[in-house]
Design a protein with these regions (language model features):
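Short helix-boundary/capping micro-motifs
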Residues: 10-28
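A short LG(V/I)-centered, amphipathic sequence patch enriched
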Residues: 40-59
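Alpha-helical linker/hinge and terminal dimerization helices associated
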Residues: 42-43, 64-86
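Central regulatory/effector-binding core of bacterial HTH transcription factors
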Residues: 89-152
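Hydrophobic hinge/microswitch elements
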Residues: 127-132, 140, 147, 207-252, ...
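Acidic, Gly/Pro-rich loop/turn segments at junctions of secondary structure
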Residues: 127-184, 239, 313-314
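A late-sequence structural motif
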Residues: 177, 253-308, 314
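Secondary-structure junction motif
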Residues: 182-209, 274, 290-298
Length: 315
C-alpha cells in the first residue's frame, strides 16, 4: 500500500470518476486505474464500485476514506516540510474556473509575486467548481477562486466572498437575433460546461438546450463569435465594457439575461493554511487586487494553464 495508491483512491471517491481523478493529478486514466487496482488487491476489497450516478463506496471503502485522506494530507505536508528545509520557495498553487484564469489569475499572481521576489513559486490550474474543494482539501491546490463552493464540514475549508460582479449576455453591435433565448446560439468558454459556474447557472435558469451551445477555447473567442452576429455570449459586465463602448458588442436586454454574482476564494481553515496561501488571501483584499479584478490589463488563454500536479507522489 503506497501514498500513490491512497491518493488515487481518495480522488476517485471524492470526484466520482477515474477520469476526474486523472485530470486532477495530471496523469493518465490507466495510471489511476492501476493504482486503484493495486490497492484493491492489497486490501482484498473493491473499495469503490461504479453506480448509476458515479462511483459508490463499499463499506470497506467508506471506512478507509477518512484515514486515507489523513495520510494523503500528511504526505503533502511532509513534502512541503522537506522543500522548506532545502530552502526551496514556498509553493502557491491557484486553481480557478476558465474565465477567471483567462482574465484574472495571471495579473493577480504576477503582482503578488513581486511582493515576495524569489520566496514564492506560483502555479495555476483550471478546474470545474465541484472539483475545487477536493483539490484544496487534498493539498493539490492552495487557493481556489470561483463561484461559491458548497460547504462540506468534513473537508475543513473556509470560503469567503471577494468580488461582486454582474454577468450579462452580449451579441453583435447591430443585433440580428430572432426568437427567444432557447432559440439563440450560445457561445461560451469552457466554464459554460460547468454546472456550478455562474455561466452554467445562467444557461440552466434559461433552459438553454445543449444543442444550442457552442464551446470555445476561451471567453475572448466566444465574444468574437457573438460579434459576428450569429448568436450570443455570456460576459462579465466590467470585462466586456470596452467592447460595448466601441460598439463591437451590445447587451441583450431580455428577461433572465443578467445575473448578479460574486467570486469567492476557498482555502484550508486558517490553522492549516500555508504562509503563501494566507498571504495571498490577504492580498486579494487590497486596493491593488481590487483594481486588477475590476480592470485587468490583459488575459491569458486557459491553454496556458494546467491542473496542479504533485509529481512526487507518482515517482
Amino acid at each position: 500500500m503506497t501514498l500513490t495508491q491512497l491518493n488515487a483512491f481518495v480522488l476517485v471517491a471524492r470526484l466520482g470518476s477515474v477520469t476526474a481523478a486523472a485530470n486532477a493529478l495530471g496523469v493518465s486514466e490507466s495510471a489511476v486505474s492501476q493504482a486503484l487496482s493495486a490497492l484493491r488487491l492489497h486490501l482484498g476489497d473493491q473499495l469503490v464500485t461504479r453506480g448509476p450516478v458515479g462511483m459508490k463506496l463499499t463499506p470497506g471503502g467508506s471506512r478507509l476514506l477518512p484515514t486515507a485522506s489523513q495520510i494523503v494530507v500528511l504526505g503533502a505536508e511532509a513534502h512541503a516540510a522537506v522543500r522548506a528545509a532545502q530552502g526551496a520557495p514556498e509553493q502557491l498553487r491557484v486553481v480557478s474556473t476558465s474565465t477567471i484564469a483567462e482574465f484574472m489569475v495571471s495579473p493577480l499572481t504576477e503582482a503578488f509575486s513581486k511582493r515576495f521576489p524569489g520566496s514564492v513559486e506560483v502555479s495555476a490550474g483550471v478546474a470545474v467548481t465541484k472539483e475545487m474543494s477536493v483539490l484544496v482539501a487534498n493539498r493539490l491546490a492552495d487557493v481556489a477562486i470561483s463561484s461559491a463552493i458548497p460547504e462540506d464540514p468534513g473537508m475543513a475549508l473556509a470560503t469567503e466572498p471577494i468580488f461582486k460582479y454582474r454577468l450579462v449576455v452580449v451579441t453583435a453591435g447591430q443585433p440580428r437575433l430572432r426568437g427567444g433565448p432557447r432559440q439563440w446560439l450560445w457561445f461560451v468558454d469552457p466554464s459554460g460546461t460547468d454546472p456550478g459556474s455562474e455561466t452554467g447557472q445562467l444557461l440552466t435558469s434559461l433552459g438553454i438546450p445543449e444543442e444550442q451551445v457552442r464551446v470555445f477555447p476561451n471567453q475572448t473567442a466566444a465574444w468574437a463569435a457573438a460579434a459576428d452576429g450569429t448568436g450570443v455570449a455570456p460576459a462579465v459586465e466590467h470585462l466586456v465594457a470596452q467592447r460595448l463602448r466601441r460598439g463591437e458588442l451590445s447587451r441583450v436586454d431580455a428577461p433572465g439575461c443578467k445575473l448578479d454574482a460574486c467570486w469567492h476564494v476557498t482555502l484550508l481553515e486558517r490553522q492549516h493554511q500555508s504562509v503563501a496561501a494566507s498571504s495571498f488571501r490577504r492580498y486579494l483584499g487590497t486596493p491593488e487586487a481590487m483594481h486588477l479584478m475590476r480592470s485587468p490589463a490583459g488575459g491569458v488563454p486557459p491553454s496556458r494553464f494546467r491542473p496542479p500536479v504533485y509529481v512526487t507522489i507518482w515517482s
